[in-house]
Amino acid sequence: MGAAASIQTTVTTINKKISEKLEQTASASATANCDINIGNIIFKKNKGCNVLVKNMCSANASAQLDAIVSAVREVYDQLTEQQKAYAPSLLTAALNIQTNVSTITQDFETYIKQKCNSDAVINNIINVQSLEVDECSAPPGQIMTFEFINTGTATGNCAMKSVLDVLTKSSDRVSGNQSTGNDFSKYLYIIGGIICFLILLYYAKKLFFMSTNDKVKVLLAKKPDVHWTTYIDTYFRSSPVLV
């Protein structure tokens, strides 16, 4: 629950920070006409994840890129040391970036600018853009809500897609860890139940089924406690008569 809440907080913080940076740097506006509209957001596999689309469009693709990178950098700087240590593996899993805690923000910026400023992205003239997101799973019993900010340019949306990939991957990791923990707890309950059953079975056997030795002990216990003088009297009464 704590990890899930932490991820959702980070997602909300990043989206808020990106919106602020786009407004300040790229003069983006929610009311501006967007050259690109978002059509569909498709998950390869989805379990409890939602994506909301928010328009913050402008024509300055370069400024959009800088704003998104700057927002991510600021949020990363505010993470705990434990969260920072976890971040490089997320970028490797989501974006195939080999990085570490010391260089992660610079490596992320380099990746974004190389990928999203490529000719394949810049020259991709589209009106309606559909996005495909990898697997996303919310922690058990939770719903994870992500926000995709439509910048209105292919370059800006490319950067936003990379951010979304990392965030959904983080949710997937948390979900997997919590599911494993829940499975382990179930195993403990099962083992405990088996032990209790065996204990009850042992005592039931003691109550209703007796071994031969136990039966002999019970029979002996039922015999009256005869005083030794009784045996002497019995002997003399039953002794043969000598002629």
Swiss-Prot record:
Topological region Intravirion: 205-243
Primary localisation category: virion
Keywords: Disulfide bond, Host-virus interaction, Late protein, Lipoprotein, Membrane, Myristate, Transmembrane, Transmembrane helix, Viral attachment to host cell, Viral envelope protein, Viral penetration into host cytoplasm, Virion, Virus entry into host cell
Any single Gene Ontology cellular-component annotation: virion membrane
Protein modification: Myristoylated. Disulfid bonds are oxidized in the cytoplasm by OPG088 protein.
Annotated localization: Virion membrane
Disulfide feature: C34-C57, C49-C136, C116-C158
Covalent lipid sites (N-myristoyl glycine): G2
Membrane topology term: Single-pass membrane protein
BP term (GO), one: virion attachment to host cell
InterPro entries: Virion_mem_poxvirus_L1
Keyword Cytoplasm: no
Inducers of expression: Expressed in the late phase of the viral replicative cycle.
Superkingdom: Viruses
Regions crossing the membrane: 184-204
Targeting to MV membrane: annotated segments: 2-12
Virion surface side: 2-183
Family: Belongs to the orthopoxvirus OPG095 family.
Assembly and interaction partners: Component of the entry fusion complex (EFC) composed of OPG053, OPG076, OPG086, OPG094, OPG095, OPG099, OPG107, OPG143, OPG104, OPG147 and OPG155. Except for OPG095 and OPG053, each of the EFC proteins is required for assembly or stability of the complex.
Task of the protein: Component of the entry fusion complex (EFC), which consists of 11 proteins. During cell infection, this complex mediates entry of the virion core into the host cytoplasm by a two-step mechanism consisting of lipid mixing of the viral and cellular membranes and subsequent pore formation.
Protein name, as recorded: Entry-fusion complex associated protein OPG095
Organism: Fowlpox virus (strain NVSL)
Gene responsible for this protein: OPG099
